């Protein structure tokens, strides 16, 4: 399957080919035809799957084919995303694929002067990429109306909830027209997300794309069977002996991530936590410190960790096991990138043993047991 076979129009196809892409990713192959057919989508996909293009390309195409001559642009598509970084990434993607069309787009987010954003809105745009807080601010000030929205994208919905944006979203939704196409994407599907999709989507086409388990084959994987109360001692012991420059530790909850940082601090090991309760500035600062090597150890929840993209990450530690085996694959896929060696260590308590079996079923690989003495 090629992009040409997905019935993408010439100006957009030209832009895609200029970027060096000819074959769509699995989610693009599944989602683009559905979105072009104007059906609602419930997409379950991680970042790094080509998800952004799977909603950006159909929206650009619809708007391009229906663009009136000489009329001032008004917002026809709204893309809501949780963070400034994601908003900018989506904006760049739209910029790339719409370059040979007359589609105008803009991006708004908090933490910066709103004046340039307001000026851009007043000039007229077709597609708006926004974070919930800044969108509500500018709506309340009368700078944005959502009456003409035909396409609505809610991206990284689980991360939105994790960061406490659910109330903002519930204030935005009633301002949207009833008749619109909704494209909803989330990496995980907890009950709160399912409840939201039930109220938002009309007969959606469900699209699931799981991470390739083959990507874990090159990573050395070991499991430590350990009592829950011994996990912190084991972690300290490993970090004190390890010479790895960067270590990423996964915790299932925000509370536990903070607790791990405190425990390590008492043992003289500096670390930082990144999760949804941290402010955007704090998350950015922690990420910057980790990427630059200023912070050696990062403790993260699954949702917050999506902003971490480092080629040289030699060691990943699963302090808690994830409930979903695909998440394990996604976690350990952070190491062993770009031909570098990678190791993934997993701490498994008695009550987590079933989860290990689920992981081994998914990957088709038995995890080697590691022995230890604390």
What are the functions of these language-model segments?
Residues 2-374:
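Conserved helicase RecA-like core
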């Amino acid at each position: 399957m090629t992009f040409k076979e997905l019935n993408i129009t010439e100006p957009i196809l030209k832009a895609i080919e200029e970027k060096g892409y000819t074959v769509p990713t699995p989610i693009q192959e599944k989602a683009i035809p559905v979105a072009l057919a104007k059906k609602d989508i419930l997409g379950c996909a991680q970042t790094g799957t080509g998800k952004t293009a799977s909603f950006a390309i159909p929206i650009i195409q619809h708007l391009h084919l229906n663009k009136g001559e000489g009329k001032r642009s008004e917002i026809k598509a709204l893309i809501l995303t949780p963070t400034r970084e994601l908003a900018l990434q989506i904006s760049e993607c739209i910029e790339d694929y719409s370059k040979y069309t007359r589609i105008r787009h803009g991006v708004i987010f908090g933490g910066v002067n709103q004046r340039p954003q307001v000026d851009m809105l007043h000039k007229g745009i077709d597609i708006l990429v926004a974070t919930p807080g800044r969108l509500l601010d500018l709506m309340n000030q009368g700078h944005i109306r959502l009456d003409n929205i035909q396409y609505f994208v809610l991206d990284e919905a689980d991360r939105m909830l994790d960061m406490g944006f659910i109330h903002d979203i519930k204030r935005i939704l009633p301002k949207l027209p009833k008749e619109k196409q909704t494209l909803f994407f989330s990496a995980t599907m907890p009950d709160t997300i399912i409840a939201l999709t039930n109220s938002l989507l009309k007969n959606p086409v469900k699209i699931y794309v799981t991470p390739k388990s083959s990507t874990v084959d090159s990573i050395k994987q070991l499991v430590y069977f350990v009592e829950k109360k011994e996990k912190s001692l084991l972690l300290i012991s490993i970090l004190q002996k390890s010479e790895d420059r960067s270590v990423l530790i996964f915790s299932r909850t925000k509370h536990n991530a903070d607790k791990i940082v405190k425990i390590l601090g008492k043992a003289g090991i500096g670390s930082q936590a990144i999760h949804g309760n941290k402010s955007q500035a704090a998350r950015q600062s922690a990420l910057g410190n980790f990427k630059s090597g200023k912070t050696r150890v990062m403790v993260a929840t699954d949702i917050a960790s999506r902003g971490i993209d480092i080629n040289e990450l030699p060691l990943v530690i699963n302090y808690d096991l994830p409930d979903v085996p695909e998440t394990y694959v996604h976690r350990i896929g952070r190491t062993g990138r770009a031909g570098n060696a990678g190791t993934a260590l997993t701490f498994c308590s008695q009550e987590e043993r079933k989860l290990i079996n689920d992981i081994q079923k998914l990957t088709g690989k038995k995890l080697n047991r590691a022995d230890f003495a604390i």
